[in-house]
C-alpha cells in the first residue's frame, strides 16, 4: 500500500447537505428555513444572550468585582525552576538570555516551590520569605530591585 492508494473507510466521510440548490435536490425553495419569520430572513436570528424578552441571565446576576488598573503582573519562578536553569546568577539579563522573559521591563517574583541544592545569587523584583531564606541558607545573595 502506498500513500496515494489510501482511502477513507466507506461511510466515515459524510458530505455536507447543500441547501438552496433547486427544487429537485429536495432542499430547495425555503432551504430548511421554513416559511417567513425572523429566522428565514437574511441576517435573521436573535443576538447572543437574547432570551425572548425575558430578562437575560447577564442582567439577572449582580455585578461583581473589577479589574484593577494598578495591578502588576509578575512572571513567577520557583526554586525548582532556578535548579533546572543551573545558573549562578539570576537577574533580568540572564533570564532574557534563557528566553524565560522577553525584556527587562517584565517583573519577576521567586516563590519557594521545589528545592535548591546549589548557591545562587538572585536580583529580582520580588521574592517570598521562604524562597529568600532557602537561597540565603545555601550561601546565596538576594537583592530586591
Swiss-Prot record:
Residues 42-52 have a biased composition (Gly residues). One of its GO terms (cellular component) is cytosolic large ribosomal subunit. Pfam families: Ribosomal_L27A. PROSITE patterns: RIBOSOMAL_L15 (PS00475). Binds to the 23S rRNA. Keywords: Ribonucleoprotein, Ribosomal protein, RNA-binding, rRNA-binding. GO terms for molecular function: rRNA binding; structural constituent of ribosome. This is Large ribosomal subunit protein uL15. HAMAP family: Ribosomal_uL15. It comes from the Bacteria. Belongs to the universal ribosomal protein uL15 family. Part of the 50S ribosomal subunit. GO terms for biological process: translation. Residues 1-54 are annotated as: Disordered. InterPro entries: Ribosomal_uL15 (IPR030878), Ribosomal_uL15/eL18 (IPR021131), Ribosomal_uL15/eL18_sf (IPR036227), Ribosomal_uL15_bac-type (IPR005749), Ribosomal_uL15_CS (IPR001196).
